[in-house]
Regions:
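His/Asp/Glu-rich metal-coordinating catalytic cores
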Residues: 32-114, 119-333, 351-365, 384-388
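A glycine- and charged-residue-rich anion-binding loop/surface
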Residues: 60, 84-98, 109-110, 402-405, ...
């Protein structure tokens, strides 16, 4: 209509008789409704200049630690707050969480924390954030239940405000209006978020797939996603985990058929199944099959016991009366009458399955009468840990089904065709692939470009990026503080690169400690030096090496006396360098050397 109005004056000027011949058109052109819309168009232009800032604090270039902050008109909201498990180089580290410096600096602006679903890579860091400051948590019923369980361990559940949300129920948070949208995933009650702001609407999918035959909760809400696409979506932030996989993700129904076949194969054996404790759908399938097969069910692993109890309480899991037994009761039934559902599908060192493989589980002893199913694929980086457990179980005589041997696992993430459907339905102006390593983000970006989204409108951001969006442009602003904070026991952030380097050094070459007593005035050795070795060599089999090392230390201390070196740090440095050089010449190894000089 606007184009018609712009063209009419020129047409009238070229044809003076036009007005008399088309008076109706002239009256239509000057109708008040047209001009009444002009202020609204001007207002829309003003709104279009309002930017929204997106700050990814985790989840880009990595799988895990998902956390994103949105800012518009001075208001902020956070979506997800997850953790990532440490890699093999992070010696002694329990988990890695995002750096909260940026959100703590802006805590007065933050209106709430929105959670897409209850997996650890999306909720695992919440207790550590709430130790910094309080803020309300918005999540679906199951998600809030899982978070509440986690916060109880930290003594934070009682003072945290939970707001239970449901799909299509809009939430007003400052200048943001957020609508949860139901999506399929490997855990119930998963949602995407449509985040409406003065700058426009952004859709963040969370973890999703499109399962046309789901076990429960219905298909991903494609209708609502399409409606937002028709209204206009400023940007889409979409799950990239399976961006390299063509086709569609298999339905969860496929797992039921595969596990049913394995139940038949293990007719006369005890069945042990390891899966994610949060995969409520999978656990329910196993329970249903156990009931069909006339077997009792037991749970092992703290998270498995806690999650299933909570899921039953909230009505997400149904276990027929008389089916559930405790793990202590397993031996009271014949092997062919029980199923044990356990944690440890990712090879976690302290998990129930890991303890079974190392014969350290107090209630369960694995042997030739066991049929073990690992119903999960290893997360990248966990392959060695899983293989170690599989080998341990096989050595004990058990039959083990793992990885792709049978259809015992399907992904909870969208493959390429589902990602294309999400892009097609939402029709975003800008696209930001999220939730994946760089190669996955890159592949997802190429998929979006193949559907016609201009490459100038596609941005592969990094953790700490300041992505500024408006209806007119997408650009990067000044980055914000970001990083990986390591949690080791009760210590949060007190393990840095220097500590990790020392731990790595100790793990590779061991430690040599030098103890000597010296005169504080003259520097002469009064006792020692004595050498203590840990993780370096077995002293009794290397006496000549240790005797030579002792002589090197004595000579270094004597030279310090002769040269009147009295600064104890300098003395320690000389001793360390002399001994390090000697040990490397003899062994080609470089243990950590720790001189301890006691002054008398």
């Amino acid at each position: 209509m606007a184009q018609v109005k712009e063209q009419n004056p020129a047409q009238a000027q070229n044809n003076p008789n036009r007005n008399s011949e088309s008076g109706g058109e002239k009256r239509t052109r000057t109708r008040r409704p047209y001009y009444n819309r002009r202020p609204r168009r001007t207002q829309q232009s003003k709104e279009a200049a309002v930017p929204i800032h997106i700050y990814p604090l985790g989840g880009l270039g990595e799988v895990g630690k998902n956390m994103t902050v949105y800012e518009c008109n001075g208001d902020m909201i956070i979506v997800d707050c997850g953790l990532v498990f440490p890699d093999s180089e992070m010696y002694g580290v329990d988990m890695v969480i995002p750096d909260f410096t940026f959100v703590v600096q802006n805590k007065d602006k933050i209106k709430g924390l929105l959670i897409t679903h209850g997996h650890e890579d999306h909720i695992g860091s919440i207790p550590y954030l709430l130790q910094k400051f309080d803020l309300p948590i918005y999540g679906t019923r199951l998600t809030c239940g899982l978070i509440r369980n986690k916060l109880e361990e930290f003594g934070l559940a009682g003072k945290t405000k939970f707001v239970e949300i449901t799909p299509k129920q809009k939430i007003k948070l400052g200048c943001f209006t957020v609508e949860p949208i139901h999506v399929n995933h490997s855990i119930p009650d998963s949602v995407a978020f449509a985040i409406d702001s003065p700058a426009g609407t952004i859709i963040q999918t969370g973890d999703f797939k499109i399962d046309y035959t789901p076990l429960a909760c219905g298909v991903t809400d494609l209708t609502t996603l399409s409606e937002y696409g028709q209204k206009g979506v400023l940007a889409l932030l979409s799950d990239s985990t399976n961006a390299e996989r063509p086709g569609f993700t298999a339905t969860e129904q496929k797992v039921a058929a595969g596990v049913r076949n394995l139940f038949a194969r293990a007719r006369n054996k005890r069945i042990i199944i390891a899966t994610f404790a949060s995969n409520i759908y999978r656990v329910q399938q196993i329970i249903d099959l156990a009931v069909e097969d006339g077997r009792k069910v037991a749970f092992s692993g703290r998270s498995m016991v806690n999650n299933t109890a909570m899921a039953q309480e909230l009505g997400y899991m149904h276990i027929p009366e008389g089916t559930l037994i405790s793990v202590d009761e397993l031996n009271q039934y014949p092997p062919e009458q029980v199923v044990l559902i356990t944690t440890g599908s990712q090879g976690e060192p302290l998990s129930a399955l890991s303890r079974m493989a190392s014969c350290s589980h107090r209630q369960v002893r694995v042997g030739p009468g066991d049929f073990i199913i690992i119903s999960a694929n290893p997360i990248p980086g966990n392959e060695k840990s899983v293989t170690k457990i599989v080998n341990g179980l096989l050595l004990l005589g058990a039959e083990v089904i793992y990885e792709s041997m049978y259809d015992v696992h399907v992904s909870g993430h969208a493959c390429q065709e589902e990602q294309k459907l999400m892009l097609t339905l939402t029709r975003p102006k800008y696209f930001l692939p999220v939730h994946g390593e760089y190669k996955q983000l890159k592949k997802h970006a190429l998929t979006a470009a193949s559907l016609g989204i201009p490459t100038s409108n596609i941005l592969i951001a990094e953790n700490g990026s300041n992505v500024i969006l408006s209806r007119d442009e997408i650009k990067l602003g000044e980055p914000v503080t970001v990083g990986a904070v390591m949690v080791d026991g009760l210590g949060v952030g007190d393990v840095g690169n220097v500590v990790l380097r020392d731990r790595k050094h100790l793990s590779e070459d061991g430690l040599v400690i030098i103890v000597a007593t010296v005169d504080s005035k003259t520097g002469k050795v009064l006792a020692g030096p004595d050498l203590v070795s840990r993780g370096f060599v077995y002293v009794r089999e290397n006496e000549s090496l240790m005797d030579g090392a002792q002589s090197i230390v004595e000579n270094a201390l004597d030279r310090c006396v002769e040269e009147h070196v009295r600064d104890w740090n300098s003395v320690k440095t000389r001793v360390r360098e002399a001994l390090s050089s000697y040990i490397y010449r003899r062994t080609k190894r470089s243990p950590m050397i720790l001189p301890i000089l006691m002054e008398v």
